[in-house]
């Protein structure tokens, strides 16, 4: 039995702080791969792997501002470093206000799925110019392995829409969906992806219109879909709300509260389903942000409790044990 200490700075097997904020866990061939943001000294997407969700081995900076680029479409912008001669406007208060001589862009909330047809690992993320949140784009990258160097294919507005906080979801039949905050965060959009997962093919649903939701997390339990998310309040935590549906493209239940009024001082990052269990166990992972000290933010992982197929909740525990 292994134990997690919530709300602390977790460290990898080399003793270094784990930087994987706004992240995602992919289970692949017996390993849990954890992807997330690293803004400690440079702006990277990091990858870690573990067999037990406790001991995390650092696998590298899998996407950086120096990553290989390969265009997929003339509509995709390959920029990973800002042009020093271009005016990007006023710095947004949520963008880190510190010296950035390398003019890096922001790659936020990276999520990765495996495409069995193309045999590629496909990353989607939220892209911004590093100064403010005016671009509101999605970004795509691919790799032949889960922890190798991803090739960057560019940023874009899916089907012409704004796209900020985001997540990915892969259904049982292999169909993939990209979910993101759109229309200045007022609405939540669900897009069905192309078979290769490299583009948004159709906007299949608009959820919570005018509700200003962000940090979306979508998962499936049995035959029912669930979505978690927070309200837009900057670095300040707020009440997590959830909804559920029998159809990802159909009608969803009204939003309902879960956890407490600050979601235990976290914002949703992802939900991971534990493999090989007689009864499915779903774990909520939240980032406990440190505001301007973004790089020292910590993590909270909690088991989700289900009551029937339309209700869920999770309670806080300082220590959480996992038996894998």
Regions from the PLM with identified roles:
Residues 1-324:
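Carbohydrate-active catalytic/glycan-binding domains of CAZyme proteins
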């Amino acid at each position: 039995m292994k134990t997690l200490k919530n709300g602390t700075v977790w460290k990898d097997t080399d003793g270094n702080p784990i930087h994987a904020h706004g992240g995602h866990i992919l289970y692949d061939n017996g390993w849990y791969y954890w992807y997330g943001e690293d803004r400690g000294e440079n702006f990277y997407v990091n990858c870690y792997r573990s067999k037990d969700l406790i001991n995390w081995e650092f696998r590298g900076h899998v996407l950086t501002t120096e990553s290989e680029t390969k265009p997929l479409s003339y509509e995709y912008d390959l920029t990973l470093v800002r042009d020093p001669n271009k005016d990007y406007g006023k710095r947004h208060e949520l963008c880190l206000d510190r010296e950035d001589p390398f003019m890096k862009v922001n790659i936020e909330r990276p999520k990765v799925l495996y495409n069995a047809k193309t045999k590629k690992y496909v990353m989607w993320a939220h892209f911004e110019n590093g100064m403010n949140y005016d671009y509101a784009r999605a970004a795509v990258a691919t790799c032949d392995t889960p922890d190798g160097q991803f090739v960057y294919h560019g940023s874009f507005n899916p089907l012409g829409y704004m796209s900020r906080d985001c997540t990915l979801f892969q259904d049982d039949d292999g169909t993939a969906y990209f979910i993101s905050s759109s229309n200045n965060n007022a609405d939540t959009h669900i897009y069905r992806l192309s078979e290769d997962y490299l583009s948004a093919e159709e906007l299949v649903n608009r959820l919570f219109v005018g509700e200003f939701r962000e940090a979306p997390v979508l998962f499936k339990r049995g035959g029912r879909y669930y979505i978690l998310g927070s309200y837009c309040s900057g670095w300040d935590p707020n009440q997590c709300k959830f909804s559920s549906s029998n159809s990802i493209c159909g009608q969803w239940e009204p939003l309902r509260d879960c956890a407490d009024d600050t979601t235990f001082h976290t914002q949703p990052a992802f939900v991971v389903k534990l493999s090989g269990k007689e009864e499915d166990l779903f774990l909520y992972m939240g980032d406990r942000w440190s505001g301007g000290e973004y790089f020292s933010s910590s993590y909270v992982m909690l088991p989700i409790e289900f009551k029937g197929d339309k209700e869920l909740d999770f309670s806080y525990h300082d220590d959480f044990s996992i038996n894998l």
